Structure formats: C-alpha cells, structure tokens
Amino acid sequence: MQFLIPVVILCVSLVDSQKVLYNNEIGFNNGFYYAFWKDSGSATFTLESGGRYAGNWTTSTNNWVGGKGWNPGNSWRTVNYSGYYGINEYANSYLSLYGWTTNPLIEYYVVESYGSYSPLNCPGGTDEGSFTSGGATYQVRKCRRTNAPSIIGTQSFDQYFSVRTPKKGFGQVSGSVNFADHVQYWASKGLPLGTHAHQIFATEGYQSSGFADITVS
C-alpha cells in the first residue's frame, strides 16, 4: 500500500460545526488535531463535533488517509474509538492508530481492522513476534520504505506495524488501543520511537471504496 503522508496545504481552527474537506488539509477541530490527505480522486473528509470524523471514498482515489487525534502524540496514550467502518473484505483499507516520530524517523500503525491486504505481508519486512494487549494478540512487523514521502520530505525510514489478530470486523466497531503496550514491546525488539509528531486514529484506503464514521477519544 502506498502510505501517505500529510502535506501542509492549509491549517485552520474550527468551532463546533460540520465541515467537508475536498482537498488536503491539517489543523485543529474541537480540541482534536486532524489530517486529511489524498493523492488523487474524489475522497472527502468530514469534520464532525468532538473527536468524530467521516470519510467517503471511491476507486477514483488511488490512496487517501484521514483521522483525528493529537499533535504532538505521546507514547502512553490510551485511545478509544467507536463508529462505523464501511468496507468489505475485498477493499484495501486500514483502520488504525497512526503516527510519526522524528530522530529516528518512524511511521507507525496499530492496525485494528483491515480489508484485503495485511501489512504483515509487506515485502522485505521482518517479523518481530507477537504480544497481548487489551485481551487481543498483536503481530508485529517492521517494514522499510526507501525514498518515500514522509513528514520531512522524501526519505528512507522504517515502519512499525502492530496488527490485531483476529482483526476487528466491518460495520459497527469499537475498542481501545493502549499505545504504551505497543511502544514497550517495540522497544524490547530494538524498535525505538523518537520525538512524536502527529498521532491520529485514522482510516486509510488504497484503490478501493468505502465509508467510515469514527469517533475518537
């Protein structure tokens, strides 16, 4: 999957009101940081009240990602989520806690659900075992991106994936991510994080179609 990452196009602060985004944008909304990025097509991202957002996409969009969360993130946050994840098993999509750090430059995902493609299959990656958090098992894989887009321009960097097994289903979903458990396990495998940049609970789609309406807290 081609992974984003948000490029600053416009940064605004919003009051309690719905706003539909058609173009790449980052900012703050009702106490939450948000990011919306796409590389093409008609995907839209709707800012709702509080930590709620909605995403709607079709196959006209090659790759998109959007979500709400925090900037900067941290290593000890417990993230709660609920709502509707409207894809099917044939759609290439992730529902995940997603973020970046610098020094080292790391892109990380805690994948709660996904469609047709699991990041555990990333080419050239290394399996880093599994652990239990919140009553669920997460399999961990480190992947490598070379000369790829990042939050500091085109770079080469590692990606860390914790993938929930079994994954959450489609339709109505809810759960929580104790991020500290992931950070501690990654560190035990020699996978450190750096200084946190943004950290969002995101929906991502790649050459697929779907709808998501998610509330983050």
UniProtKB/Swiss-Prot annotation:
Glycosylation sites: 56, 80
Tissue-level expression: Expressed in larval carcasses and gut, and adult gut.
Annotated signal sequence range: 1-17
Keywords in alphabetical order: Carbohydrate metabolism, Digestion, Glycoprotein, Glycosidase, Hydrolase, Polysaccharide degradation, Secreted, Signal, Xylan degradation
Top-level taxon: Eukaryota
This protein's GO CC annotations: extracellular region
Residues the record marks as active site: 107, 204
GO MF term list: endo-1,4-beta-xylanase activity
One of the protein's GO biological processes: xylan catabolic process
Domain GH11 span(s) in chain numbering: 20-217
Cell compartments where the protein resides: Secreted
A Pfam family this chain is assigned to: Glyco_hydro_11
InterPro entries reported in the protein's UniProt record: ConA-like_dom_sf, GH11/12, GH11_AS_1, GH11_AS_2, GH11_dom, Glyco_hydro_11
Family stated for the protein in its record: Belongs to the glycosyl hydrolase 11 (cellulase G) family.
Name this protein carries in UniProt: Endo-1,4-beta-xylanase
